[in-house]
Amino acid sequence: AGFVVDNVDTVVAIYEAVCESKPLVRKILTVTGDAVASPGNFRVPLGTNYQQVISAAGGFSEDPEKVISGGPMMGMPLFVLDIPVTKNSSSILAFKKDPVAEEATTPCINCGRCVTACPENLMPTLMMVASLQKNTERFEKLYGMECIECGCCSYVCPAKRPLTQGFKQMKRKVNAEKRAKAAKAQGGK
């Protein structure tokens, strides 16, 4: 027995796909943050440019220091707004001040808070070392691919280490290496 937690947009998309045979062509995006002129929720076609969605929210009230695609804990920073809305898009956050940049990252103090906070019972401290060393084999042995990228470890870290971002990058690296290895194996036959 377990639970499935989904947002309303996903539930509606499932209903429309199953009961009405409608493909997913629109997405509801939340545009918010202290740098957004008129925050709100916007239902936009997939492929719509992020800049167009921000314009629909009245644009920026002032130039943001930080723009994030996704939530505050699991979102990724945006450096360009000329990207399309996809089925995985959920929100655009724009902040006048970067809340993370105000506190400098310091070396890990091995307090173990990230280990305690991890809902998957992983070892973020060791995974981060493997990530910094770009050691994909070690990262996999530490079950780094099981990370759900929830952001809990980064949130509780007193050293303000970008743990979740490091794990996301490392998982992409592992997957890219696996694809390259598979392609090489297929090409060698």
Predicted regions and their residues:
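Hydrophobic alpha-helical positions that pack around
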Residues: 1-50, 56-61, 71
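Catalytic cores of large soluble enzymes that bind and process phosphate-bearing ligands
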Residues: 2-10, 23, 41-45, 84, ...
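Structured core elements
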Residues: 4, 30, 41-43, 52, ...
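Active-site gating/interface segments in enzymes
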Residues: 58-109
